[in-house]
Amino acid sequence: MSLQWTAVATFLYAEVFVVLLLCIPFISPKRWQKIFKSRLVELLVSYGNTFFVVLIVILVLLVIDAVREIRKYDDVTEKVNLQNNPGAMEHFHMKLFRAQRNLYIAGFSLLLSFLLRRLVTLISQQATLLASNEAFKKQAESASEAAKKYMEENDQLKKGAAVDGGKLDVGNAEVKLEEENRSLKADLQKLKDELASTKQKLEKAENQVLAMRKQSEGLTKEYDRLLEEHAKLQAAVDGPMDKKEE
């Protein structure tokens, strides 16, 4: 394997490791959000867009080069005279195998680049929704406590007005308290609606993250299967060549 394909394969292994790390269930999105907001990660992200575009361009060029090599060595029977070159068939099969291997490596690297970027975005969105959900819940609890407090004060004022024998204008007090109660109830209902909307968004984000995790696990299994086929084909190619050299 040449130096450039060794670098691409190493990058692919690193991508698989990071995807598996992000899919670990016991690390919460909030903790990942703290990591993403750290100074080191923010420094990397500041140059990340340019690096990502350059990386995508390089991987696309490598995929195109691998496809070109596959088409070049695809039909060996029409390009090689097997009677005059008995060992050429094995040579062409080896070239074709390497081109296919390079296509798999570059293709999976390109796919995991988009998958990794999308997975990080979904985790950040999920952490933001969790924080918003907690904030709305606290606001709803605060509004509920305030409403209970005003209702208790309303009852106390009614009792005080009855004891004083009409010294207080009970009608005006009741009107004011009812208006305050209606206002508090409206605020409470608004907070409940916002909390329900946030919960729906959170469930949607969690479903998207779960789908991305399942997709990444499927890609990892497929890559492991291709590695096994790679090893088998490599052994099949190296065996006849070793015998030929002997």
UniProtKB/Swiss-Prot annotation:
Membrane topology (Lumenal): 2-6, 65-102
Post-translational modification: Cleaved by CASP8 and other caspases.
Tissue expression profile of the protein: Ubiquitous. Highly expressed in neurons and discrete endocrine cells.
Outcome reported for the amino acid change (mutating residue 238 to A): Abolishes cleavage by caspases, inhibits apoptotic membrane blebbing and release of cytochrome c from mitochondria
Topological domain spans for side Cytoplasmic: 28-43, 124-246
Domain of life from the UniProt record: Eukaryota
Subunit structure: Homodimer and heterodimer with BCAP29. Binds CASP8 (isoform 9) as a complex containing BCAP31, BCAP29, BCL2 and/or BCL2L1. Forms a complex (via C-terminus) with TOMM40 which mediates the translocation of components of the mitochondrial membrane respiratory chain NADH dehydrogenase (Complex I) from the cytosol to the mitochondria; within the complex BCAP31 interacts directly with unprocessed and processed NDUFS4 and NDUFB11. Interacts with VDAC1. Interacts with VAMP3, VAMP1 and membrane IgD immunoglobulins. Interacts with HACD2. (Microbial infection) Interacts (via C-terminus) with HRSV membrane protein SH; this interaction is direct.
Linked pathology: Deafness, dystonia, and cerebral hypomyelination: An X-linked recessive syndrome characterized by sensorineural deafness, intellectual disability, dysmorphic facial features, dystonia, pyramidal signs, almost no psychomotor development, and hypomyelination on brain imaging. BCAP31 is deleted in the chromosome Xq28 deletion syndrome which involves BCAP31 and the and the promoter region of ABCD1.
Function: Functions as a chaperone protein. Is one of the most abundant endoplasmic reticulum (ER) proteins. Plays a role in the export of secreted proteins in the ER, the recognition of abnormally folded protein and their targeting to the ER associated-degradation (ERAD). Also serves as a cargo receptor for the export of transmembrane proteins. Plays a role in the assembly of the mitochondrial membrane respiratory chain NADH dehydrogenase (Complex I) by stimulating the translocation of NDUFS4 and NDUFB11 from the cytosol to the mitochondria via interaction with TOMM40.
This protein's name: B-cell receptor-associated protein 31
Species per Swiss-Prot/TrEMBL record: Homo sapiens
Lineage summary: Eukaryota, Metazoa, Chordata, Craniata, Vertebrata
